[in-house]
């Protein structure tokens, strides 16, 4: 009995101080996508790009997964299935106030599990390549590596005029 009370007490304390894991669910929320991206200007400083991601969040071609904490969307991901065997992580972003809590990893793990269960074998993601020195994107590349992605190739003029690194993760 003591261990059950202790565990229950720990959960209540975690909830009280806001460290409970977020709920991960499939939901479209273009407004939350815009809000989160606008709060991340080091990655999403182009208003046109934010408009495009907001439209993608409303587009049924993309699967939208969100992380919700206390009723607020604090993380978003958009995935597009190109073929039965492969999909692209089109967007992942976490509210800066919620960074460092494992929310990005939880979103990717959820997306990967859903895709794997549906027969998908490979997940790709595009980010700014290492030949363009930029500290925020160096953090992005490190995050993708830490969540199981491996660099495949770098191209110029793919998603923007500079270098794009394509990373892949086996599911």
For every predicted segment, state its role.
Residues 62, 162-167:
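Short hydrophobic/aromatic beta-strand or adjacent loop that forms the aromatic wall/cage
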Residues 24-91, 95, 108-109, 114, ...:
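Acetyl-CoA-dependent GNAT
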Residues 141-154:
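Conserved acetyl-CoA-binding loop of GNAT-fold acetyltransferases
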């Amino acid at each position: 009995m003591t261990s059950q009370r202790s565990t229950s007490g720990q959960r209540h304390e975690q909830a009280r101080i806001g460290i409970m894991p977020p709920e991960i669910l499939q939901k479209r929320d273009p407004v939350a996508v815009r809000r989160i991206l606008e709060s991340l200007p080091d990655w999403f400083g182009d208003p046109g790009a934010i408009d495009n991601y907001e439209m993608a969040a409303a587009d049924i071609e993309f699967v939208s997964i969100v992380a919700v904490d206390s009723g607020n969307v604090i993380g978003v991901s958009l995935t597009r299935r190109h073929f039965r065997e492969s999909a692209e992580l089109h967007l992942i972003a976490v509210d800066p106030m919620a960074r460092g809590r494992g929310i990005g990893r939880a979103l990717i793990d959820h997306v990967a599990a859903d895709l794997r269960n549906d027969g998908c074998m490979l997940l790709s993601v595009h980010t700014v390549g290492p030949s363009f020195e930029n500290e925020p994107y160096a953090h992005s590349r490190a995050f993708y590596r830490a969540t199981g992605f491996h660099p495949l190739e770098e191209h110029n003029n793919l998603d923007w005029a500079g270098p794009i690194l394509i990373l892949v993760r086996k599911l």
